């Protein structure tokens, strides 16, 4: 009987190792010390005789999925391939954190291992094609993410450029308008430029004689300022072609202090000669000699010196100097102090008329003695109330405007 079972097993393709394993298993369950071959024959024969025994079905047959040979009284359902033990499936791990970004923007987690389907047989791992299939989506995902990042960067750059352009257009802009009619005032300039946009400020530059013929107009936006400049530049207004340009910031440069005097003095020659004659001695200046100075000082000793700074004037200053035209040219750098202004006055001071009265002559001598030689007389001078000489003319007035300081100047 056992030989028949073994022959049937060989015909059906059974592996005899399962039978041996099953007999070994049966051996451990409590059989006495019998040989392996005898136990195998002893256990196969009772299995066919006892169909109701739950241990009658061989383990190898149930594991391989085949029905037992003698299943006459077996009440258990036949095992199918669907009820086989499934191999280990990869657990889907959660995706890594994306630094606060939602999962929509993060790269999707791809399954690292392929699950074995029941249709395939023994192989638990996929071939090279499956690996390529899984690596291709990862590569495409990386390319897609890099493309998305590049597009986002380009979008941010374009948006920042648009913001800069809008800020530039929205910033105020100042225009310089020149050659405007002299009768124009701020309302006239505002009316002329107001048609192009909102104006923040209008300013026409004036001096003590009136309008200087140019001004500034500040628009709220640079776009309006550019449009006004294009429309109004080189247009003729009341016979004058006005010019409209972009106003530039005034550059404040630190100019080197160049002394206006040729001899390198730090102070004006007039101031230096008055308050410190011994410090500012000019070559060629007609100072008296020491003996003449001593004689003059002795003659004027005890006399009451009137005027400012009596302690400043020494024996040298007590002697009346010669006429101003004989002074060296280095002393006067401008017409304001030159003979253009004081030449006539000095001429009539030192050229007294011969027919003058004795009192007038004495007064003139006293005036010459007590004056400082620069037109300032500190005593009663009968000629002091006379009008200036004819040499005080247009040239002197022009030099006053050019060289002097005017409080009406806008700069």
Curated annotation (Swiss-Prot):
Keyword RNA-binding: yes
Chain positions of site Interaction with RNA: 174, 182-183, 207, 212, 216, 240, 250
GO biological process: mRNA processing; nervous system development; regulation of alternative mRNA splicing, via spliceosome; RNA splicing
Domain of life: Eukaryota
Region (Disordered), start-end ranges: 16-175
Annotated keywords: Cytoplasm, mRNA processing, mRNA splicing, Nucleus, RNA-binding
Polar residues bias: start-end ranges: 58-83, 99-119
Record-level GO cellular component terms: cytoplasm; nucleus
Keyword Nucleus belongs to the record: yes
GO MF term set: mRNA binding
Entry function: RNA-binding protein that regulates alternative splicing events by binding to 5'-UGCAUGU-3' elements. Regulates alternative splicing of tissue-specific exons.
Assembly and binders: Interacts with papd4/gld2.
Protein name: RNA binding protein fox-1 homolog 2
Name of the gene encoding the protein in the UniProt record: rbfox2
